Amino acid sequence: MRVAILGMGAIGHLVARALDGRAALVFVDRTRAPVREGERHVDAALVTTKTPGTPWAADVAARLLDPEGVVLTIQNGLGNYETLAQRLGRERVALGVIYVGAALRPDGSLFSTGPGAIEAAPPAADGPARRFGELATLLRAGGMRVSVVADPWPSVWRKLVANAAMNPTTALFGCTNAELLAHPAGAPLADELARETARVASGAGVAIREDEAVAMWRRIGETLGANRSSMLQDVAAGRPTEIDAINGAVASEGERRGVPAPVNRAMTLLVAALSEPRGESATAESAAAG
């Protein structure tokens, strides 16, 4: 099986490690031309890029993917599936989530809290669904836990509860998941983000109890205690974050469903401000004010 990995960050490296020696891998990032002359198409494409890169990934997949091939997105947040489906057709796109803590060390080596667990639903079309099954088998052979579900949206919203609770708070307070659990301000804030996200999920048709949502993020926080969230890593590195696709998307979906989500909206603004470049003018203003 020929598999493209679109986005070579930590999750891309993790998936590549699982598939190494089991599939013919094509690594694609923004520095590589998506299709070289004479290059074969791929049977499957795994989208592991951050949300801002999804339109790019959709364009690359459209050029690389075999007509009977499948695209599997295991990205964070909302909106990625729709972007891919609009470009490639819903019948070829599989939606899933991954649970793992991972980061690339300065020397380029991979740190992860484990092999990773994926929950995903196959696409509707027969050919892409068969390729999805083959890909799931290869990932399992590489040590990943892969659960195939009929409806991906409960998995998406449950992962979103954890992301919405932990990612912005760890970024705001500069702490690991374990440190967040013990933080006198951060932990209650994450609890409220989880409760609010559960209310929005229920409004969107995925019933999640508020107490269940709180227990969910806390359980993941304990399991992946040493992990530094991807949003914390992005803020520390001065990279764009996925705040709009996570807390921003929760707030927007809440507005659409008539479910207020003011804490998610506030966190979206705070992390966006935290991520703004601080140039010489900002430094000069700070010095003048001091």
Residue positions per predicted region:
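Short internal beta-strands
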Residues: 26-30, 120, 251
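Rossmann-like NAD(P)(H) cofactor-binding subdomain of soluble oxidoreductases
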Residues: 17-18, 35-109
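Residues at the C-termini of beta-strands that transition into short coil/loop
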Residues: 29-31, 75, 97, 114, ...
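NAD(P)-dependent Rossmann-like dehydrogenase/reductase catalytic/cofactor-binding core
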Residues: 191-290
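Internal alpha-helical scaffold of NAD(P)-dependent oxidoreductase catalytic cores
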Residues: 63-64, 83, 87-92, 109-210
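NAD(P)+-binding Rossmann beta1-loop-alpha1 motif at the extreme N-terminus of oxidoreductases
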Residues: 1-36
